[in-house]
Amino acid sequence: MHNETSKRKIPIFPEITSSKDLIAYLDSSERLNKRKYLYHYTTIRNAIAIFKSGTWHLGNPRDMNDVVEYRNGDQQRWNNIFFASFMAENKESIAMWSMYSQPWKDGVKIAIPMSTMKEWLKGIDEILEVSPTNYELTGKSIPVNERNTIHISSVAYSNTASCDSSGDSETLMWSNQKNTKIPNCQQLSELTGYIKDNAWDYEKEVRLKAEFENTFGYSRVAVKIPNSILNEITISSGPLFEGDLLQRMEYELNRSFHTDQSFFAG
C-alpha cells in the first residue's frame, strides 16, 4: 500500500489538492532525506525497558496527549492505528524535554540514525500484541504484509482551530511549507493520524506506525528491535538529569552504550 503510493509522481506540498496525495507525500521516505537522526524524548526507565525487552511499544491513539486530534479523527480508523512518536528536528527542544522526559531527573533522549531507522523497518516482520495491564507481550502476533503495515510518516499541522477566531485563512503546514488547497483537512476521516493542530508544530513529529485491520481487538502493540539496531542508538541525559547516565544504564543492562548529554545541562 505505502510502496505503491511512493512510486507515483507526488505534487510539491503547496500544490497538493487531495487527501490521497497528501498521504503519499507524508508517507514518502523522501521527506526525511535531509534528516540524520530521529529523536525520541522519554525517561531512563523507558529506555532501559526498550533495551531489556528488545522491543519498542506502539501505543493506541486513545492514550495520546492530544485529545483534539483524537476527537477530530475517525474512531474506527483510530482502532487500526498504533504509533510511537519521534522528532525530526535536529535542534534540541526544551519543550520536548518538558513534555515527554519527566521527571526531569530521569529525562533522556534517544537518537536513532536515519539510515539505521530504515534498516530497522525493513527487518520488522511481525506486530506483537502487548497486554494493556502489565505491558508484557501476550505471545500473540500478526505478520507484516501488504495489509498489515509498518512504516514511518510525517505529521502536518493545521491552523483550523485558530483561524476561526482570528480570521486567517485555513492553512496546512509541513516543515517551512504551506498549503491552502485542502479545506477542512482535520475533519477528513482518511487523514486520521496525519494532521495535528499547529499548537503542536514545535514537535516536528514523525510517527513509527503500525496499521492493520484490528479484528483481534489489540489495544497496544510492539515491534522487535534487534541488537544491531540498539548498538547504533545514542542516549543523551536531560538538562536536569541526576547521576551518571552511563553508570545507570550499564548497571541495569550490563552492556556498553553511546551516550551524550543535553546542550542545556549545567
Residue ranges: model-predicted function:
Residues 1-266:
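NAD-dependent ADP-ribosyltransferases
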